Each structure stands twice: as C-alpha cells, then as structure tokens.
Amino acid sequence: MAQEDVFKKLVAHCKEYGYVFQSSEIYDGLSAVYDYGQYGVELKNNIKKYWWDSMILLHENVVGIDSAIFMHPTIWKASGHVDAFNDPLIDNKDSKKRYRADVLIEEQLAKIEDKIIKEVEKAHKRFGEAFDEAQFRATNARVLENQQKWDDLHSRFARALNDSNLEELRQIIIDQEIVCPVSGTRNWTEVRQFNLMFSTDMGSTADGAMKIFLRPETAQGIFVNYLNVQKSGRMKIPFGIAQIGKAFRNEIVARQFIFRMREFEQMEMQFFVEPGTELEWFRTWREARMKWHQALGFGSENYRFHEHEKLAHYANAAVDVEYRFPFGFKEVEGIHSRTDFDLSQHEQYSGKKLRYFDPEKNESYVPYVVETSIGVDRMFLQVIAASYHEEEVTGANGEKDIRTVLRIPPALAPVKLAVLPLVKKDGQPEKAREIIDSLKFDFNCQYDEKDSIGKRYRRQDAIGTPFCITIDHQTEQDNTVTIRTRDTMEQERIPVEKIREIVAEKVSMKNLFRKLN
C-alpha cells in the first residue's frame, strides 16, 4: 500500500474511532485546527504523563511550572521573536497558493532520497541475504548519481539558509524545476519573510489597549520565572524546569493533519547549567531523549538524529529527533544548547539581574541552558502512525478477514480493559458491571454488550484496547473469565480476583520507565 494511502487511512481511522475531529466541523471546519475526541484526549493525557513523570519523577533536579499564555510583550522583543520569528514564503502566481520555500526544497531532497532508497530496496529483494548495502551504495551508478544530486542540493540549500539568502532560495526552486502541487506551473513570486506570531489587544478600549501576543513557545515562561523557581526551591545548578502548555503560530502552510497546526501543545524542559558544561549536557540529553522515544518499542530503525544545518540565533548546538512517518522522516523533538542568550536578553530588557550565585565557586554567573522541546500533537501522530496495522486473519468460519488494530503501548492506551458479557442474559451483564465497578479506580475500563463477541473484539482492537475480559457461562461456575490479548489475539482463563493484578502490571507506566534507567 502506498504511504500516501496509509496516511489517509490513519486520518479516517482517527475520526471514525473518536481520536481526532476537524474543529468546528458543522461550520465546514477551520483550517489546521483540530479537536481531540474521547479516546484522543485519553491518549494525549497518557503521552503527557509519560513525559512529565519521566522528567519530574525520574530526575530529582527537574521541577515543573505552569506559566501564563499571555505575557508582557517586551518578552517577545527580548527573545528575538518580534524581529526574527519568520518563515520564508513563496507564492505561485497561477494557483495563488502560498508555500514555505524551505519546505519545497526539503521535499525535493526527500524525493531524491526516495529514489536512492527504492534502488536499495530493489537490490535487497534481488540478492536477499547476500546483499551488501554499503557496497551497493558505493558502486551502483544510479545510486551514485542521485547521491551526488542530493549532496549538491543539500550543500547549496544549507548555505542559503545559513546566509538567510532569500534570492538563492528562490533560485534553487527555479533550478530544481519545482512545480506548484496545485497548478503544476513554475510561475513563482519572490521569497519574503513572514512573522508567525498571533497578536491581540489587552484592555477595554482600542486607544488604551496594549498589543500582546499569543505565545509561540512555552520556553520564555520558564526563563522569566527561572530565578523564582531557583530561590523558592533552593535549587542548585544543574537543574531543570519542565512545562506542558499550549502555543500558537500563524502557520501559512499548515498541513499533514495534526503534524503542523496553528494551535498546538508543547512539552519543554529547560536545563540550567554552568557555562562551559553546556555541550556535555547537550550530549547527555540528546541520548536520553532518543532513549525515551525508543522505549515505546516502535523500532530503533524508525528514528534518527538530524543535525541542524543552520543554528537558531540563540543556539550553539542543535539536533532533532526524527521519526519515519508515512510521509517521511520528520521532526518530533528538538534538543538545543541555547547558551545564555535568553537570560542575558531578559536581563538587558527588564533591567533585573538574572544571575545565579554558585556557593561552591563563590561567584555569580548567567547560566547556560540546554532545552528539550517536543510537540504533544506530533508525538500523538507518531504513536498512532506506529501503532496502526492492518492484517489478514482467518475467522472461526474459515473465511479471511482484515483486522485493523492499534498496537498502542499498553501504558499509553486510552482504554486499558474492555469487559464483555458473552450474552445479555443469565446474569452475565450484572457480573460484568460488578467487575468494572471493582476496577474503575485502577485503570480506564469500558463495558460493551452490543453485537457479537467477534465484532466487539474487532472494535476494541481498532480503539487500541490491550486487553478484553469475557464473562461467559463458565464464569458462574468457577468465577473465572477469559482474558484476550490484543496483539496476539491469544486467550486464557484467569480467576476474577487476578484481573486487577494481571492487567495493572501489564499497563503500568513503570514498564516504560524501567527502560530509561
């Protein structure tokens, strides 16, 4: 199945099973704005809990904060967002559609890379176990030709970004003969910068109102509170401050479902360190964050690091954790060494000292900062994309069928356990309700009695429920039930009194945390 078709199925599945809805749908929707449904909000909360607890519970020197969305407008001048938070945009004169110039070029690079990958995959199928990929890449003429094209374009693109050369970005688009996806033409305007911040007025009258911004990131709320947290918590460097919260960006090119939205949620941690140690801590958090992603069990081959070609104005090192989505490798998390840029800027613009006094060295300094920043919505999409499977199964009648299943890690699954009476009589519904009542304070359970047991299993598979308990006629005799495992479809009988112990152990977040130590 083509990857584009897989992605369309993911989007349709999310709507059909209550994960994600188009916002304001009865009014024909609002572009790049989405709502999370009954299962989506549970998965989202579980992802946030996994991140929050892995930061706060597993690190004694990391604490949390919840800062306001509205902040003093000078904060955004100090941070550089007013002057430098821009995207390079280009319009197609025929379709009147607007695109990010850098994204058009990145997609061209991805197309060249796809050609290389297809050549390698074809050769691998042809030669089987004897295939030497390294040798093939080094000797195959088509691979070498495309690799040279990729290297040349990548180098030219990196220079243009580093120099903020908008004319060169346009020239690359022209030279690569990149066409508008809508019109199919190459009739492009000049490239220009566009600021991404939303603004509004705070105050009762237009004349007396103050222009403020909806925060484009959560990090600045941490920086302006860092000294409050340090002093009130008696924190010693190195220490971190973590936050989960909404951010807003006026993305002109917002697409790929919830991957890029105008209203989104971030999970960020700013780690304050002694100047001179920031790159060591950068490497430490770089490896720790990749480990966090891989602990979910989606395959290490589906992750990679992407070093930044152009560093942001505040950074001296930066790397992205990328995941292989159906539409290619894309960023899910960024790790940045932000130096002392933010705190020094806020010192300058506020006139307040933001220095840390080091009692061991008997000196004061502005700490350097290492940041980890992950998008909740992108992480959500990663989990759904990695978990979605279609497989052929043989039914009890011997007929072939397609089973759609979300193999969400049990600790993140919205519903942990479905309790299903085999029939709606003989006291089975009452027994099922009794079991749910005894478990509902331990984990999220769902009762379902509609349709055949086979259809109910399929429905829970599509939701991503890791375990189903079935109450049948034998339950009345020996107080046992059937427990079915989602991923294997295997079933076994267990005593009712063992349900809590068995399920709780398998859905515990501790199973993920153990992989991080």
List PLM regions with ranges.
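NTP/phosphate- and nucleic-acid-binding module
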Residues: 1-517
